[in-house]
Amino acid sequence: LTIPAGTTVYGDKASKAALIVERGGKLNINGTNDNPVVMTSAQENPAPEDWGGLIINGWSTLNVPGGIASGEGDTGDFGCDPSVAGQCDEADNSGSMKYFRIEYAGIEYSPDNELNGIALQGVGSGTELHHFQVLYNKDDGIEMFGGTPSFSYGILTGCADDSVDWTQGWRGNAQFVVIQQDGNDADNGIEADNLQEDNDATPRANPNLYNFTFIGDPINGEESDIGVL
């Protein structure tokens, strides 16, 4: 799927719509600095949790038993079985996504069963992701579930829960990221796990983070943890 510059994509609230890329698929978001792609709510008066956000599933490795996991919110399988020759691809390419904004997304079905603004699930290092914003998301702004994807020039604004989150052995890079916490319903700037069920699971999470800026809301934030980590 290729989305041209200047396109607006509307997510339907009633059906809890989300844009899901299955393993082997590619999404190219071809926004530009002057003409970005916008993914937003179809509601006349938009609000967080109006739709499900962007989910990318790939063939890179995880540290879960068997190597394959099923995405929260029934968003499909991701990862790979290391015992199957040629199935795992650390350089898996799920497309090129640049100059776009995601607004009013994220769905909380139940605790630990939620959709993020952007979910990179078993995504490989061949995937390109830069110059994006996640705005007013119900759950995490961006979460990496294992894999080796990298991203840069990201802005996470007013996201509930955590702005950046990872688990299941993420091993990518992130640079030039600005986080502005939601003053009323945020958790942490970053939540970092190797694997909640087994802290020694391999491959271990080992991302490299550079040039992060965190902005809290200590004046209005009664419910926000206002924490960096």
Question: Which role does the model predict for each range below?
Answer:
Residues 1-229:
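Beta-strand/loop edge motif enriched in small/polar residues
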